[in-house]
């Protein structure tokens, strides 16, 4: 009779322990019900990129002196710079500049080391195409500025963290105090 009684006691202890684990898990689940959803509806809601986000490269043709520093610092020798030497002005004349974003790793070395600041990173990250050859941007495509996410009224922008919403409210309140 004692083995049967000890079996019932151990079964009861295991049942209580299992109920306690289920209760703890349920409390953790309930604590997450007040959180905002992490998933966003991508085409209609977009995250605002950080200030130092490295997106598509913007190129200003008039500033470029064809020094090819961008090619030398690029880990994959990606930018293609075509130039010719003008004897009358004794300077290089830029003919063509192109970057293949299908190969680019967006490291930002070309932007950082450019002596004339003709290269800059934009917040544009939507570079998907059906043909990989369309990712080869020449100087005309590189000089186009991206459409700002903030200016598009059809897209709802989502901040990445709740702290940024608090900071935004603080900055809004401080602006209303200082602006008369």
Swiss-Prot record:
[4Fe-4S] cluster 2 binds at residues 74, 104, 107, 110. It is found in: Plastid, Chloroplast thylakoid membrane. It is an enzyme of class 7 (translocase). Gene3D superfamilies: 3.30.70.3270. Its EC number is 7.1.1.-. Keywords: 4Fe-4S, Chloroplast, Iron, Iron-sulfur, Membrane, Metal-binding, NAD, NADP, Plastid, Plastoquinone, Quinone, Repeat, Thylakoid, Translocase. The keyword Translocase applies. Residues 55-84, 95-124 form the 4Fe-4S ferredoxin-type domain. InterPro entries: 4Fe4S_Fe-S-bd (IPR017896), 4Fe4S_Fe_S_CS (IPR017900), NADH_quinone_OxRdtase_chainI (IPR010226), NDHI (IPR004497). Binds 2 [4Fe-4S] clusters per subunit. GO terms for molecular function: 4 iron, 4 sulfur cluster binding; iron ion binding; NADH dehydrogenase (ubiquinone) activity; quinone binding. One of its GO terms (cellular component) is chloroplast thylakoid membrane. [4Fe-4S] cluster 1 binds at residues 64, 67, 70, 114. It comes from the Eukaryota. Its cofactor is [4Fe-4S] cluster. It is a peripheral membrane protein. Pfam families: Fer4_10. It catalyses: a plastoquinone + NADH + (n+1) H(+)(in) = a plastoquinol + NAD(+) + n H(+)(out); a plastoquinone + NADPH + (n+1) H(+)(in) = a plastoquinol + NADP(+) + n H(+)(out). One of its GO terms (biological process) is photosynthesis, light reaction. Belongs to the complex I 23 kDa subunit family. PANTHER family: NAD(P)H-QUINONE OXIDOREDUCTASE SUBUNIT I, CHLOROPLASTIC. NDH shuttles electrons from NAD(P)H:plastoquinone, via FMN and iron-sulfur (Fe-S) centers, to quinones in the photosynthetic chain and possibly in a chloroplast respiratory chain. The immediate electron acceptor for the enzyme in this species is believed to be plastoquinone. Couples the redox reaction to proton translocation, and thus conserves the redox energy in a proton gradient. NDH is composed of at least 16 different subunits, 5 of which are encoded in the nucleus. This is NAD(P)H-quinone oxidoreductase subunit I, chloroplastic.
